[in-house]
Design a protein with these regions (language model features):
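Short beta-strands within extracellular/lumenal beta-sheet-rich domains
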Residues: 54-74
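Solvent-exposed beta-strand/loop surfaces of large extracellular or lumenal domains
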Residues: 44, 52, 88, 92-111
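Intrinsic-disorder/low-complexity, polar/charged segments enriched in Ser/Thr/Lys/Arg/Asp/Glu/Gln
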Residues: 63-69, 80-82, 121-123
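Short, flexible loop/turn segments at beta-strand junctions in immunoglobulin-like
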Residues: 74, 112-117
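Aromatic-lined ligand-binding clefts that engage carbohydrates, nucleic acids, or primary amines
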Residues: 75-95, 124
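Solvent-exposed, conformationally flexible loop/turn segments
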Residues: 61-63, 105-106, 117-121
């Protein structure tokens, strides 16, 4: 096995430790529907049914409403809490009457703590849409969890090990560079060597995953502080959304898709005051104001703040 392959393998192990703790929500209920206008739905059943891990859920071009009352376990009370749900659908999450965020194929986790006060009971109301075309049809092995019909893998209240998460982000960036032919071969060879050396500092056989701090310090000192491969100029990270009003979905679904997009950007703005975002279509502002006035007011405050 080449050093870079050994690094890749251990990077997969490292990602398993992002969550410090995970507590499964076991009382979820689901009701399937089909959207017939911007805010009207035709339900397939008269009532909700239980949603358990391993169940098939969602339908092509289908909507699902998911709910649960969750008592936060004592061992998690007072901690920074996250909600985790792996899904191929696009889900807007409301907790105790407030839209808190969203999950989708690109983000399985959303922060809860600043938005739930100190309440020990959380009422989840979720609305999800799954488009008519699989999210990733290139990989047949993933269709069971990323297709139009998918296997429910569970929903969790979690705590995050931020040291591990930060290290994962650093490795993700550097591994992408090391595998890209857009960068010169000397730099890529340097990265493959030093990423392997950094990963060697982590003891994956220890109960507490020893070596995280040492690995991070090695990356900071040897890779990020290295002047031999530095270029000139600044890098700007810019977020923009030009939402396809109709693509692999109908126009009426753009109302909820836009809500999720806006929610995710608002939460990034909450966390990163320097984060700026542009949303360029009048139609999506109009539907947000019409159907989700509370979120629209929150958006207006961000506009006032220059975000």
């Amino acid at each position: 096995m080449r050093p870079e392959e050994w690094t890749d393998l251990r990077f997969g192990w490292l990602k398993r430790y992002i969550y410090s703790s995970k507590w499964e929500i076991t009382n979820l209920m689901i009701r399937d529907a089909r959207q017939i206008s911007e805010m009207e739905f035709e339900y397939y059943s008269d009532d909700y049914r239980p949603l358990n891990k391993g169940d098939m859920y969602f339908t092509p071009d289908g909507t699902a409403f998911i709910k649960a009352d969750v008592d936060i376990p004592k061992e998690l009370q007072g901690k920074e809490l996250w909600f985790s749900l792996k899904t191929a659908a696009e889900i807007c999450v409301k907790i105790n009457g407030k839209y808190v965020g969203g999950v989708d194929p690109n983000r399985e986790r959303m922060l809860l703590s600043p938005y739930i006060d100190d309440k020990k009971t959380l009422h989840f109301d979720m609305m999800g849409y799954n488009r008519s075309k699989p999210d990733d049809e290139r990989n047949p092995e993933s269709l069971s969890v990323r297709g139009c019909r998918q296997i429910f893998e569970g929903a969790y209240i979690c705590t995050v090990n931020h040291k591990v998460q930060n290290l994962v982000w650093d490795f993700e960036l550097l591994l992408d560079i090391a595998k890209s032919e857009l960068f010169n071969e000397d730099y890529r060879n340097f990265l493959n060597k030093e990423l392997n050396n950094a990963m060697n500092l982590i003891d994956f056989d220890s109960d507490e995953l020893d070596g995280i701090d040492e690995c991070q310090k090695y990356l900071d000192d040897v890779v990020f502080a290295n002047d031999n491969y530095k270029g000139n100029g600044d890098v700007a990270l810019i977020a923009h959304s030009h939402l396809d009003i109709a693509y692999y979905w109908r126009r009426i679904h753009a109302v909820q898709k836009n809500l999720r997009t806006v929610l995710i950007q608002l939460r990034l703005m909450d966390k990163y005051p320097d984060f700026k975002y542009t949303h360029t279509q009048p139609y999506v502002y109009e539907t947000l104001e019409k159907y989700y006035p509370d979120v629209f007011e929150e958006l207006k405050e961000k506009v006032k703040n220059g975000q």
